[in-house]
Amino acid sequence: MFFQSRILYYKMKLQNKNLRGASIRDFRFTPLDKNSLLELYRKSRTVIDIQHPKQTGLTMRCIETVGAKRKLITTNPHIKEYDFYDENNILAVNRENPIVPTGFLESPYREISAEVYENYRIDHWLKTIFDSWVFPW
């Protein structure tokens, strides 16, 4: 598990009874480099995303998981509003009572349309941003 800082780790450990018995060695405090992250996605079938409770938008992990064509389990219910949402590939669980049906993990990833993948490529995002700008000259 990753924490942005040791201070956050200790704060969460004090606040969350489930972390009280955890060892600091079980956590990372530096982000993975690009190659390590890609290798981790390559080896994974399913990715878990636990977003901040007040966050409504998606984490980068959600976008990366779609791009990696891996299944996603997330605590963010807003993911159901996105065009790439497919209940076969993405499971939004209740933060307080996360239930993951066995069938979700056992079923294969279902491809989504190439057009949807294209919408989330960085070059497409940049084109969308720059095409929407109005230049005064």
Regions found by a protein language model. Give the residues of each.
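Short low-complexity, flexible loop/linker segments enriched in glycine and/or proline
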Residues: 12-16, 64, 87-90
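Nucleotide-sugar donor-binding catalytic core of glycosyltransferases
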Residues: 1-55, 59, 75-79, 122-137
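A short acidic (Asp/Glu
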Residues: 59-62, 84-85
